[in-house]
């Protein structure tokens, strides 16, 4: 059995289990944006290099040894995608674009390497191509990595794919579908969005990989199910509406205006489609509460999954985070900035 993880008490996780756990979770998270097949492909092969004898020795005999395991999945898929899409008649430029995105995400899932340096210039390659093309004499790519990849591919029917060719086809369709929604004005804009795809795919892959690594020897983190997320969002909405209900009827002209704004924000939160909107109000208008009212109606009525509150000053952010928590409670709230201090017993 090939191992993906082994801890100091001897507990183990197989590479097969880890590969398909990550593939399934990444696909599940990416389905709502139509990228599920592509993320399954990335998840399935992201740790392919761990099949190498050198990495297996690291796990079982020499845990401090450094082994580059991220390159192998990129190298393997680079060739498979090239052969498959070429046979399908996909033009070279389009194929290379897709191929390099897939390879980069896998090769960079333990750290990005998009800075040009003397080494990459010396080889006349970008770092990605140099990394996957450079011979590694002490690795066992054909005997270990390719054989394990072939083994994984025999399991694909259990996950809805006839074979690797079908998975590559569907993954390419996912990417083309996403690309077709963009209206790029020039090549620089197109390249920018390609970099955005890379970071999106990396985020989805890393989320699934980290979760399964944490849970490798038993369930430690259990993400909220969709039904639980819906209930949580509804609880936010009920809480903010309760707060507005406690204000009572306005007794001054200023409070009448505030009440009118609040009702308009509520209506827009219920009906606004995806877009960029601006809430331009003076200090004292109650923008924190208004933002929550708008956002929580969007979460529930427009089926949004997240609400980000961003502000430029830490003092304001800390103050408003506290105000938000007074309404929502702690469940589902992540406060992330440089003044957050992790509290520990020691």
Features from the language model and the residues they span:
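Walker A/P-loop
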Residues: 271-298
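Conserved Walker A/P-loop ATP-binding site and its immediately adjacent core
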Residues: 295, 304-328, 337-340
